[in-house]
């Protein structure tokens, strides 16, 4: 599968390397260009912008740092939201708030883009060894499309619902447990 991969930090870099080792084609972008070099050394193509990484991709995977990074890439200076193609699969692995995930879900739905929220649990070593756990949420068909990619870098995938923000709410511990 052809993947646009955004965010090659401590978690993103080993995830990208696992995807490359699984035979996927990656076009990679990172705010700090130096962080793309290990993936490029393993066969990834460097992209100058997030939109260039997405061009011609079947899916994009984002492992950006926080809400501010996602805001900058999708709605700020890069305006990636305007470049995404209908039918694209977006697997969102970075740590963001449930509120921003909901905003992204609405914007994606309005453009015919499948969003699967997939925050990861584990360390960079776990990522490098394919031992991450993933909390996934999204439409059933989208999660099914995402599963082979998620399996490239995780050993456990817990699907928690059809609304992408559910995954980040659980990841953030912001869902109250019902009391008996």
List the predicted regions and their residue ranges.
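Rossmann-fold NAD(P) dinucleotide-binding segment
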Residues: 50-115
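Rossmann-fold dinucleotide-binding core
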Residues: 95-176
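Active-site-proximal alpha-helical scaffold in enzymes
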Residues: 178-180
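Short glycine-aspartate micro-motif
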Residues: 2-5, 90, 115-117, 135
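NAD(P)+-binding Rossmann beta1-loop-alpha1 motif at the extreme N-terminus of oxidoreductases
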Residues: 1-62, 88, 124, 156-158
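Class I S-adenosyl-L-methionine
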Residues: 20, 37-41, 71, 105-109, ...
């Amino acid at each position: 599968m052809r993947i646009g991969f955004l965010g090659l930090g401590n978690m993103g870099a080993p995830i990208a390397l696992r995807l490359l080792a699984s035979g996927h084609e990656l076009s990679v972008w990172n705010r700090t260009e130096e962080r793309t070099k290990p993936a490029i050394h393993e066969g990834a193509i460097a992209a100058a912008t997030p939109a260039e990484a997405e061009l011609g991709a079947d899916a994009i995977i984002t492992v950006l740092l926080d809400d501010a990074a996602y805001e900058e890439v999708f709605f700020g200076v890069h305006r990636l939201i305007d470049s995404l193609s209908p039918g694209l699969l977006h697997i969102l692995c970075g740590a963001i708030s449930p509120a921003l995930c909901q905003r992204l879900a609405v914007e994606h739905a309005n453009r015919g883009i499948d969003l699967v929220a997939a925050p990861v649990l584990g360390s960079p070593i776990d990522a490098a060894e394919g031992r991450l756990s993933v909390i996934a949420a999204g439409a059933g068909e989208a999660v099914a499309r995402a599963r082979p990619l998620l399996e490239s870098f995780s050993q456990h995938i817990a699907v928690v619902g059809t609304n992408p923000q559910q995954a980040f709410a659980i990841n953030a511990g912001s869902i109250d447990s019902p009391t008996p």
